[in-house]
Design a protein with these regions (language model features):
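Short, low-complexity, polybasic intrinsically disordered segments
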Residues: 99-112
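Conserved catalytic cores of phosphodiester-cleaving nucleases, focusing on short active-site segments
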Residues: 39-60, 75
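Acidic-basic catalytic patches of nuclease active cores, encompassing PD-(D/E)XK
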Residues: 1-30
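Hydrophobic "anchor" residues on beta-strands that sit immediately upstream
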Residues: 26, 49-51, 91
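Positively charged, solvent-exposed patches that mediate nucleic-acid binding
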Residues: 44-45, 90, 108-111
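Catalytic cores of nucleic-acid endonucleases
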Residues: 56-102
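Short acidic/glycine-enriched loop/turn segments that link adjacent beta-strands
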Residues: 34-38
C-alpha cells in the first residue's frame, strides 16, 4: 500500500466515524488488529456491536466489490478474537461503509 492509499484510508475512516456519530453510534475502537486481520471501526448502537469495514475511493468503480469472501473470513476470525480477548459474547453484525466522491453508502448486516 502506498502512502497516498494509506492517507486516503484514514480520511475515509474519519468520514465514516463522523457519519456513524451522527447516526447515534458510540465508537468503541478504530483499527483493531489481530493476527487474523483488522477491523476498521467497532461501534455500538441499541445494544448491538457493529464491526464496520470502510472502503473509500475517488476512482470510478464499484468499491463494494473490494470486499470478497476472503476478506470477510478474515473479518470473522478477527471478530472471534475480539470477543475472546475482551471476554464478551454480545450480539453483533458486520456492516460496510462505502465512500465514493464524498457520498456515503451504509450497508448494514452484510453477509455472503
Amino acid at each position: 500500500m502506498g502512502l497516498k492509499s494509506y492517507f486516503d484510508g484514514i480520511l475515509g475512516e474519519d468520514k465514516a466515524c463522523e457519519f456513524l456519530k451522527k447516526q447515534g453510534f458510540k465508537l468503541i475502537k478504530r483499527n483493531f488488529h489481530s493476527q487474523f486481520g483488522e477491523i476498521d471501526i467497532i461501534a455500538k448502537k441499541d445494544g448491538i456491536l457493529h464491526f464496520i469495514e470502510v472502503k473509500y475511493t475517488q476512482k470510478d468503480y464499484e468499491i463494494s466489490e473490494r470486499l470478497d469472501n476472503k476478506k470477510l473470513n478474515k473479518i470473522l476470525k478477527t471478530i472471534d478474537f475480539y470477543h475472546l480477548k475482551n471476554g464478551i459474547s454480545e450480539d453483533f453484525q458486520i456492516d460496510l461503509i462505502c465512500i465514493k466522491n464524498d457520498k456515503i453508502q451504509f450497508c448494514e448486516n452484510i453477509s455472503f
